[in-house]
Amino acid sequence: MNLKVGIIADRLNRVLTGVGTYVYHLVRELSKIEDISLITYQDPSLPFDVPTVIKNPFGVFSNHSLYLWHLYVNGALHRTTEFDIIHSPENAALITPVACKKVITIHDLILYLFPHYAGLIHRVRYRMLLPWTVKTADRIIAVSQSTKRDLVTRVGVPQHKITVIYPGVGPEFRPCNLNTIKEMREKYHLCNPFILYTGTLAPHKNVSTLVTSFKRLKDSGMPHSLVITGVKGWRYHSVFETIRRLHLEKDVVFPGYIPYEDLPSIYSAADLYVYPSLYEGFGLPVVEAMACGCPVVASNVSSLPEVVGDAGVLATPAVDELATSMQEVLSNEGLRGELSRKGLERASKFTWEKTAAETKKVYEELV
């Protein structure tokens, strides 16, 4: 049976962050399956392109009009009957009835559970659309058991409607050799040993707490820098205010957005990766770090214990607890080696091929 699947993929029209990475790799792996025909709704002129996929039959709006773009695509899908499945893999609502089965991937419920982490218009729109989205979907893919629990207990979605499918990590995420690491250090001017954080600068990512914990380490004589990469999100200014207040301008390094191809080398070069988030639906950067052999300290909240298992140190995402865990790992070479080995083994369980195969199974169950 040849399945015709339409995938709403406007995340490929922007800088790739966690959800965009999921969409990109899901589309790439599904496109390799012979009995699935894909059409994605994206801008084919941008770099995140999958050559074997038909793209963009309905046109593209600017990044500043993505909400209108969703309405436009929804209207177009309402009129078409060419698909067996329409899949929205990025929390986006399919708000009009369509003549085929609808699948949606829910990555997290951050704006539903913690509405103060977004602006008024965005959070009102999300809280209005999410209940309708999950009600009208034929199947919901949750990226973790934690996200599934949130959907069941907080939104009232029936358990039988939800399938948990973990995201993956690509084979490009592996420990890099010394020459590659040296080139990366020179490119981004990273001379000192360093602790790494990658991700959006947003309130729920708790980066200001990480900076304050790092200050405790500097006061104890640790030689490390703190390297913070990623895009500036909502209310990112608080991170820079914390750095100035603690006089850490020379110790906290912002190389900016790191291109995808450079991520493995920066993970490989770090002595420690820290993920202090207050809430995650999955936590893909943690798996990427483990896949590169970097020891991990992560928050003990939401999905992160599920993802990390015993392959990292889990800590309460507060200043003292994070500082203690970071100090413990950095001062114990044997522990770092153990976490590196366990992380490599743990990360190997998450592959995009597996994600795509399990997603295909969901499609087949619906038609």
PLM feature spans:
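Carbohydrate transferase catalytic cores enriched for Leloir-type hexosyltransferases
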Residues: 1-367
